[in-house]
Structure formats: structure tokens, C-alpha cells
Amino acid sequence: MKIFFLIMAVAALGLGGCTAAHYYERQSDRVTFYLQAPGAQQVVFACSLDEYNPHPAGKAGDSRWKVSVTAGSEFRYFYIVDGAVYVPDCKFYEKDDFGSRNCVYVPE
């Protein structure tokens, strides 16, 4: 019985860290980005598709934000959360000209 509870405790701890703070979903020629930003008042998405023009994200739940863009090719992106640049954990990164990095979206 102790082994069962130990296994369940380890599984619960492992699953607790699986909540993604950032992910995307592709729908034909568009991609929708989601960002978990608890307490944020404003989230903006900026990408290289249009020279980093701001795309205001909309609320998609209590602390989740979403924004959709056309996605036919690879592009770089980041978020601005309450006025501060935020680069989430991404599969692909690229250094920018300012000593930081941007996420890179690569169509699958």
C-alpha cells in the first residue's frame, strides 16, 4: 500500500509541471498563439511577418490570452506583457540584434 501512495505522489508531482505557459494551434493558413499570463492586464504579440507591428491578444479564460496570425512561412515572435518584453520557452530561438532572442515559428 505504501508503494501505491508513493507512486501516486510521484505521478502527481510530475503532472503538476505539465501546464504549458505558451503553445500554438495551426488551422489551415492561420496559427493561434496562447499565453498563460496570470494577473496580466494587457498582452501584445509582435512578429516578423509585419515588421513587429503589435497585435493585441484577447482574453481566452481567466489567465490565458490568444492571438491569431496568418502563418504560411517561418517567422520570429515575442510577447509584450504589461509593457515588458516576454520571450516564452519555445522549441526554436534566434538571437536578435539587441542581445536578446526571439522565438521562431516553423510550420510543420
Please give the residue ranges for each predicted region.
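Bacterial Sec-type N-terminal signal peptides, specifically the leucine/valine-rich hydrophobic h-region
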Residues: A12-L15
